[in-house]
A protein has these predicted regions:
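Bulky hydrophobic segments
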Residues: 1-125, 144-155
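C-terminal or internal capping secondary-structure element at the end of a domain, subdomain, or sheet
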Residues: 138-143
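Non-cytosolic membrane-interface motifs at loop->transmembrane helix junctions
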Residues: 126-135
Length: 155
């Protein structure tokens, strides 16, 4: 956290707290989105059943209409939004250049896309889904808006 950011935003949390939160968040994000990675000999079995979801919103719409999959689909979408809210809040505190919505959302989009690509490169129980990128990006925007509200309100 830049000292100049903290000097300009007296309502910002202490630098050590922001850095600690960022480290914990990064570790949790890695565990939740990338692990477990399968490195065993039976990897081919996972590759054969593996297909990325590349059509935005279609799969969400279909699954939300299906009573058996509705709750799991809704929980997954909400979970993906919630997962990236801390990123949208922490980024402007950590990187002063990311003090604009579009910059922070762009960084969230890039990170989410990188995570999804890593899921394609290292198959495990995860599979890439374009809807995850969309929901994660929305979560980043929500986090940034919360940052704007909370930092300014506390001032």
């Amino acid at each position: 956290v830049s000292r100049s950011r903290l000097a300009r935003e007296p309502s910002a949390p202490p630098a050590w707290a922001v850095r600690s939160a960022a480290v914990l968040y990064a570790a949790a994000l890695f565990v939740i989105t990338v692990l477990p990675i399968r490195w065993r000999a039976d990897l081919g079995r996972y590759r054969n059943n593996w297909r990325p979801q590349l059509v935005p919103v279609w799969n969400l719409a279909v699954n939300l209409r299906d009573g058996d999959r509705r709750l799991a689909t809704l929980a997954g979408a909400v979970g993906n939004v919630v997962l990236f809210v801390p990123l949208g809040f922490l980024l402007p505190l950590l990187v002063p250049r990311l003090d604009r919505l579009w910059r922070t959302v762009g960084a969230g989009f890039a990170l989410s896309a990188a995570i999804e690509l890593s899921q394609a490169a290292f198959p495990g129980i995860r599979r890439p889904d374009v809807n995850d990128v969309l929901m994660n990006t929305l979560g980043t925007a929500v986090g940034f808006l919360a940052y704007r509200l909370l930092v300014r309100v506390r001032a």
